A protein has these predicted regions:
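A short catalytic or substrate-binding loop motif that flags glycine-/basic-rich loops and adjacent residues
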Residues: 24, 44-47, 175-178
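Solvent-exposed, amphipathic alpha-helical segments
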Residues: 59, 127-138
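Active-site-proximal loop/helix segment associated with metal-binding centers of metalloenzymes
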Residues: 2-16, 66-80, 132
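Metallo-beta-lactamase
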Residues: 1-42, 48-118
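Histidine/acidic-residue-rich catalytic or RNA/ligand-binding cores of hydrolases
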Residues: 117-126
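Soluble or luminal CAZymes and related metallo-dependent hydrolases
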Residues: 83-90, 127, 176-179
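C-terminal regulatory/interaction regions
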Residues: 134-191
């Protein structure tokens, strides 16, 4: 990522005072109020810096980008596998650790809160395996060509779920597929 790319996609990054930064450790308890504690869980695999947050009281895990993208149409999980940190084994280990929790729902950045966390975690693992296999079979294509092929494959998958063309277009518009290709290829290069 370049500074220009980050600014275009997420705005200007401004410095903050060092004393405002608190180190987070795996398993740390964050007291929300006198009756509620959220547990910080180090959750690498998608990115080395990633944490998920578990609210034992409600059985909710806040996973950010760890699980991928989940749209309202069924349980089709679109992985989020960016460079340089995507690592399948580490991500699966993270997901297996999270599966051991008593979960009632999962909240993800893209998109929403879902009441079938174990099913979605399973679907995420299956989707990641499918994406790796698909992308691994495109070694001679440029990043752009592979990205275009991935989009064609995804559109076919969405259509098989009877999702309308406008919605598919919106879903595809949310993906940076060249970045996904780069993340998977970077991972496969070191296997």
């Amino acid at each position: 990522y370049t500074e220009e790319w980050l600014k275009k996609n997420w705005g200007e990054i401004k410095p903050i005072p060092l004393e405002n930064i608190k180190k987070l450790n795996d398993g740390a308890d964050i007291k929300i109020d006198k009756n509620r504690i959220i547990k910080a869980l180090y959750s690498p695999g998608h990115a080395k810096h990633h944490y998920s947050f578990y609210d034992e009281t409600s059985g909710t895990i806040f996973m950010g980008d760890t699980l991928g993208l989940i749209y309202p149409h069924g349980n089709f999980v679109q992985p989020n596998l960016p460079p340089p940190d995507f690592d399948k084994e580490v991500l699966f280990s993270t997901l297996e650790h999270i599966e051991k929790l008593e979960l009632k729902q999962v909240a993800i950045a893209h998109f929403g809160i879902h009441s079938n966390p174990y099913e979605l975690i399973n679907n995420a693992k299956e989707s990641i395996d499918l994406w790796l296999q698909f992308i691994d079979n495109l070694p001679d294509l440029t990043q752009k060509e592979a990205s275009d092929r991935l989009v064609e494959w995804l559109v076919a998958n969405y259509k098989s779920l009877n999702i309308d063309d406008k919605t598919i277009s919106n879903y595809i518009g949310n993906g940076n597929f060249e970045m996904q290709i780069n993340g998977v290829r970077n991972y496969l290069k070191y296997q």
